[in-house]
């Protein structure tokens, strides 16, 4: 029997699936010599573009007399899928002991995004001089690795035997507390079991907590276990204690059926009683680690983000020849459709290896017969609707506008179903190789709401997410309904969505903000949706691709 007042569960860690700690390992090959007699003493400086400026965040150690260094010091960064995170790697010669690069010590640099590195696991790029030319045949290789274990969970089961009796007319009511030792040597409570009434041989309920909560992901961190006899007054009687580490707990229960036990010691009794042995024993009956896969696990395991664009060409956007039109192609300012395309697509393209994106339009009359279509290729090639990079999507959009007639209605279901087709074929593989993201840019109320709800409910069971950006000042109430944030979306027949896959954002909320703010908002949910889908299907990430640079080890610094 347990006392509910004593049952305590720590606050679970926030589900920040989009944020991970990434370590970058850097090596260079063929660095330029400063002169014919000496080789450089290279160091790599890492800068991150933040708040409109480049800020140094990390640097490697200096290696002496080495033109092809493999650095041992890792460069650590927080990774966010929904942010672009541009990086610069500057290589300089620290022969004279300088701690910052100067023109005469500069050996080359390169620029890329963190997304490009993690999606490819390993990136090799030429080093460029300040004039933009290659620094000879110099190259830099960056290898990404996620800091593992931060999302793992632990399942533990404890029981005790022959605990000291602290009650006069009945038996003890034992419970146990677990503490981890912090860096400042203070103890932090991480778990308290329930109370087992009137029992000197209690079996506590199994419990589950994150490895971070238990030991801050440090398997060698000291853990302290304290056993008490519960008292309703709050003055619980101390029975005994013992210490361990998670490493020891894992090793002691490594084999099937293997258990680990500790003597429960009361220091006061041990010091005063000559023949004192213990105040009972505590047994660890189960210690298992549950691997919780992250978004980066799937990306680094080879999962590609397949990005598709759908653009609203209904008449409610206004005549493109008018400066008031949402599709106006002004030479001075890109319209909202273009701004959203660049902001969101610029990030998604880093996660697609071939950088080719299907782009469709809906709600327009299209040549040659000028019949209304709700899923036409904006490059007018139905057999190959893909565009080369986001710049290709933008170019096709610009060429498409003068050739079509904006019409209506605003039917969204056809394009959702079109993208759902390949997603369903991907689902049948049972592997985490391709996840589809559909970006819908629209200016108004959905005309086929019932069909759209049905299409979304169907897509919620597939490896697919939908991002809707509302352009203009229309009433977007229906879009918020599709988002599902206020409750589970259902199709007209009452079938619920398997998961929330729609993210809606009105562009007007970001028209005065930076493009990165819009991208951050609309893409923030994608990592969670990716992990949710594959976890629901029991699909693990693929094995990380080999990424060790094949280079000769550097001489010792």
From Swiss-Prot:
GO cellular component: axon; clathrin-coated vesicle; dendrite; endosome; membrane; perikaryon; plasma membrane
Residue span(s) of domain VWFA: 306-526
Cell membrane recorded as keyword: yes
Positions with a binding annotation for Ca(2+) 1: 167, 173, 229, 231
Compartment(s) of residence: Cytoplasm; Cell membrane; Endosome; Cytoplasmic vesicle, Clathrin-coated vesicle
Gene Ontology molecular-function annotations: calcium-dependent phospholipid binding; metal ion binding; phosphatidylserine binding
This protein's UniProt keywords: Calcium, Cell membrane, Cell projection, Cytoplasm, Cytoplasmic vesicle, Differentiation, Endosome, Membrane, Metal-binding, Repeat
Ranges where the record places region Linker region: 244-303
Residue ranges occupied by any C2 domain in the UniProt entry: 1-127, 134-263
The keyword Plastid belongs to this UniProt entry's keyword annotation: no
Predominant place of localization: cytoplasm
Named cofactor requirement(s): Ca(2+)
Written domain comment of the UniProt record: The C2 domain 1 binds phospholipids in a calcium-independent manner and is not necessary for calcium-mediated translocation and association to the plasma membrane. The C2 domain 2 binds phospholipids in a calcium-dependent manner and is necessary for calcium-mediated translocation and association to the plasma membrane. The linker region contributes to the calcium-dependent translocation and association to the plasma membrane. The VWFA domain is necessary for association with intracellular clathrin-coated vesicles in a calcium-dependent manner.
Function: Calcium-dependent phospholipid-binding protein that plays a role in calcium-mediated intracellular processes. Binds phospholipid membranes in a calcium-dependent manner. Plays a role in dendrite formation by melanocytes.
Family label: Belongs to the copine family.
Quaternary structure note: Interacts (via second C2 domain) with OS9 (via C-terminus); this interaction occurs in a calcium-dependent manner in vitro. May interact with NECAB1.
Name of this chain's protein: Copine-6
Lineage: Eukaryota, Metazoa, Chordata, Craniata, Vertebrata
Gene from which the chain derives: CPNE6
């Amino acid at each position: 029997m347990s006392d509910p007042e004593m049952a305590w569960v720590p606050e679970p860690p926030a589900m920040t699936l989009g944020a991970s700690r990434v370590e970058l390992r850097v090596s260079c090959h063929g660095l330029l010599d400063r002169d014919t007699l000496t080789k450089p003493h290279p160091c790599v400086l890492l800068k991150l573009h933040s708040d409109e400026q480049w800020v140094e965040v990390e640097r490697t150690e200096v290696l002496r007399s080495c033109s092809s260094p493999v650095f041992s010091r890792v460069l650590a960064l927080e990774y966010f899928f929904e942010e672009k995170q541009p990086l610069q790697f500057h290589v300089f010669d620290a022969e004279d002991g300088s701690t910052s690069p100067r023109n005469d010590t500069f050996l080359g640099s390169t620029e890329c995004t963190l997304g490009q590195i993690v999606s490819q696991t390993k990136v090799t790029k030429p080093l460029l001089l300040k004039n933009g030319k290659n620094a000879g045949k110099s190259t830099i290789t960056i290898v990404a690795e996620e800091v593992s274990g931060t999302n793992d969970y632990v399942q533990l089961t404890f029981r005790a035997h022959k605990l000291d009796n602290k009650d006069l007319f009945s038996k003890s009511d034992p419970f146990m507390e677990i503490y981890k030792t912090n860096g400042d040597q203070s103890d932090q409570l991480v778990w308290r079991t329930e109370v087992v009434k009137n029992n000197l041989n209690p079996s506590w309920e199994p419990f589950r907590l994150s490895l971070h909560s238990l030991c801050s992901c440090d398997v060698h961190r000291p853990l302290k276990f304290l056993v008490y006899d519960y008292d309703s007054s709050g003055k619980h009687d101390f029975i005994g204690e013992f210490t361990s580490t998670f490493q020891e707990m894992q090793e002691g229960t490594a084999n099937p059926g293997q258990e680990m036990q500790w003597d429960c010691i009361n220091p006061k009794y041990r010091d005063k009683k000559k023949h004192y042995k213990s105040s009972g024993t505590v047994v660890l009956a189960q210690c298992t680690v549950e691997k919780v896969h992250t978004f980066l696990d799937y990306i680094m395991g080879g999962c590609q983000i397949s990005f598709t664009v759908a653009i609203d060409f209904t008449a409610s956007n206004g005549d493109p020849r008018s400066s008031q039109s949402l599709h106006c192609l002004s030479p001075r300012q890109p319209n909202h459709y273009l701004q959203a395309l660049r902001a969101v697509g610029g990030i998604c393209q880093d996660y697609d290896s071939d950088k080719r994106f299907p782009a469709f339009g809906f709600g327009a009359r299209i040549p040659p017969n000028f019949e209304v279509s709700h899923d036409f290729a904006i490059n007018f090639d139905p057999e190959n609707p893909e565009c080369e990079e986001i710049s290709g999507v933008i170019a096709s959009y610009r060429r498409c506008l003068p050739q079509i007639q904006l019409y209506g209605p605003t039917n969204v279901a056809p394009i959702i179903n079109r993208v759902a087709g390949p997603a369903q074929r991907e689902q049948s593989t049972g592997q985490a190789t391709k996840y589809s993201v559909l970006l819908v840019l629209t200016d108004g109320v959905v005309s086929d709401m019932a069909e759209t709800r049905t299409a979304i409910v169907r897509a919620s069971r597939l490896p697919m997410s939908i991002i809707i950006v509302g352009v203009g000042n229309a009433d977007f109430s229906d879009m918020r309904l599709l988002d599902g944030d206020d409750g589970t979306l259902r199709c007209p027949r009452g079938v619920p969505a398997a998961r929330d896959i729609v993210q809606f954002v009105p562009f007007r909320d970001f028209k005065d903000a930076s493009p990165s703010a819009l991208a951050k908002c609309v893409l923030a949910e994608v990592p969670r949706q990716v992990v949710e889908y594959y976890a629901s299907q029991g699909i693990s990430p693929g094995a990380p691709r080999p990424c060790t640079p094949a280079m000769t080890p550097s001489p010792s610094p």
